[in-house]
Amino acid sequence: MKLGVISDSHDNLHKLEAGVSILCAHDLAMVVHAGDFIAPFTARYFASLPDLEIPFAGVFGNNDGEKFGLRKMFEPIGPIHEDKFEVELGGRRIIVVHKELLVEPLARSGDYDVVVYGHTHRIDVRTDPCLIVNPGEAGGWTTGKSTLAIVDLTDLSATIEEF
């Protein structure tokens, strides 16, 4: 069972379209966005997920000012949560947050098998004390690299894909 992880798309529509195409090509149990979508119209790039029966959820980032519009546009696709999103997939407990502030305490809590975050625009994949994943940035504005992560929930590993 696999989880698609994307974050910090920051309205780079060309890169967002490419990233979602990559996600759709995988056999995913779910896709999560770890925040900083920016504009509500970015929802149209995720619109194919329900047709493929891939559940979606996200969390707001610090740059997501138009929360009402984002929630409304994403409503047919999946929910966007205020601070955190928790889910169990394949017997694995997963939490998604935007900022890195709580990553270490969440990872050490023993409550989660996977902690996903965004915000820093830097790839981070660690396996101790649990799987910690920051997919980097989909928008590519800061680093010049657009990346996402595919998390294998069977062996608790993550692969970074650049696009």
Task: Give the residues covered by each predicted segment.
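Core catalytic region of metal-dependent phosphoesterases/phosphodiesterases
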Residues: K2-E88
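Active-site environment of divalent metal-dependent phosphoester hydrolases
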Residues: H10-K15, I38-F41, N63-G69, L101-L106, ...
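Short, low-complexity, polar/charged sequence segments that are solvent-exposed and flexible
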Residues: L23-H26, D51, P76-P79, V114-G118, ...
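Internal catalytic-core helix/loop-beta-alpha segment
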Residues: E82-R122
